[in-house]
Amino acid sequence: MSLHYQTGFGNACATEALPGALPAGRNSPQICPYGLYAEQLSGTAFTAPRAENRRSWLYRIRPGVQHLPFAPFAGAQRWLSDFGRQPVTPNQLRWSPLPMPDAPTDFIDGMHTWGGNGGPEEQSGVGIHLYAANRSMQGRFFYNADGEMLIVPQQGRLRLATELGLIDIEPYEIAVVPRGVRLRVELLDDVARGYVLENFGTAMRLPELGPIGSNCLANARDFQIPVAWYEDVEGDFELIAKFTGGFWRAPITHSPLNVVAWHGTHAPYKYDLRNFNTVGSISYDHPDPSIFTVLTSPSDTPGTANMDFAIFPPRILAMENTFRPPWFHRNIASEFMGLIHGVYDAKAEGFAPGGASLHNCMSGHGPDADTFEKASHADTSQAHYIRDTMAFMFETRRVIRPTAQALASPQRQDDYYQCWQGLQKHFDPEQA
């Protein structure tokens, strides 16, 4: 089944699965075409500036309110939103990939929270999760009232069956599901593994380009939004809600994926990271990693993001007389990294696809000893092609608080610090 999409980041879209299902000239007619119900889904305040306002009108077979009462849900045991107030270690942390589950596990029950900050009630901060699943969601649907979800597959393809249409993603692609959108996650392969950033703050947008100009980085035209699709199915289902960090379950006698037409700006979307237009130095020095930003969630402080999503894709390094890998760094922001494919150019060993690392505020990090030695003696008169890689970073203004399950995980590499212990002292006061 080949899916079709609309294009353009943040566009006001209009789509219908049946001809004439979208009302003409108004949002809420007295009687909707085909006997549908009109329902508005608001992702921002009514009075948010027009350029930032996100809402969609949905025309559905049954309204979203039609389900039985919610009760606490006992699943999703490893998906957390309470990051506690206990002291956080300043040590650099790294993990090997999650193993695939043995028991039948879907996207919801296969989520493992590795860290986060802030929270849904203050509508600021993030949750950072890894998932490993071996079956599709069956007989259940899910929505997240706490934040939008940025899904980064590392292994296995996913189909996101959402209220607003179908999205297929594979490794090298990402998808964003806005706050409140109901969906079912289906596996298109036997197993699936990847990363999820849960953004409690302002919805993600494209970063400003400044002197770069009107093009480059992630171009708006390359983002894809689903077309209307619906299923008219009745049965005994459950609707799972994530609300203020807790999980709730409501019985529902029909599929909530019953939107026949919709228009607006609050919609899921996908993006192929291979379309990222990378920029960099063509003279000397390695620019700041902000040039690799794909999406950003602004905070109330200008120039300081609630979170940034950046990637380190295949690229050409042409800087002369320059240490080309990412330099040693201590940062006021906190950095969580993952690897989708290949090798990260600052770490020769130990950082595997599906793995993760955390370098919190002011914790030193940088290339390992082997990478430093090789890059220090490389011939920089020749361009260097980095082909076999796709790494990414979730960067936040707040300290990322690792969860107890992340710290106790058998995937944690307790010897991570050793990768820097081989760095030699080269200082010689007699020779500049």
Swiss-Prot record:
Active-site feature positions:
286
Out of the domains of life, which is the source?
Answer: Bacteria
Q: Which GO terms describe its cellular component?
A: cytoplasm
Catalytic reactions of this protein: homogentisate + O2 = 4-maleylacetoacetate + H(+)
Q: By its UniProt entry, which SUPFAM superfamilies does this protein fall under?
A: RmlC-like cupins
Residue intervals passing through the bilayer: none
BP GO annotations: L-phenylalanine catabolic process; tyrosine catabolic process
Obligatory cofactor(s): Fe cation
Cross-referenced InterPro entries, in alphabetical order? HgmA_C, HgmA_N, Homogentis_dOase, Homogentis_dOase_bac, RmlC-like_jellyroll, RmlC_Cupin_sf
**Which EC class does it fall in?**
oxidoreductase
Q: Where does Fe cation bind?
A: 329, 335, 365
Gene3D superfamilies named in the record? Jelly Rolls
Its pathway, per UniProt, is: Amino-acid degradation; L-phenylalanine degradation; acetoacetate and fumarate from L-phenylalanine: step 4/6
Q: Which residues bind homogentisate?
A: 344, 365
Keyword set for this entry? Dioxygenase, Iron, Metal-binding, Oxidoreductase, Phenylalanine catabolism, Tyrosine catabolism
Molecular function GO labels:
homogentisate 1,2-dioxygenase activity; iron ion binding
* This protein's record includes keyword Oxidoreductase: yes
Q: Does the keyword Membrane apply?
A: no
State its Enzyme Commission number(s): 1.13.11.5
Of which family is this protein a member? Answer: Belongs to the homogentisate dioxygenase family.
Query: Self-association or partners: how does it assemble?
Result: Hexamer; dimer of trimers.
| Protein role | Involved in the catabolism of homogentisate (2,5-dihydroxyphenylacetate or 2,5-OH-PhAc), a central intermediate in the degradation of phenylalanine and tyrosine. Catalyzes the oxidative ring cleavage of the aromatic ring of homogentisate to yield maleylacetoacetate.
Q: Which NCBIfam families match?
A: hmgA (TIGR01015)
Name this protein carries in UniProt? Homogentisate 1,2-dioxygenase
What is the gene called?
Answer: hmgA
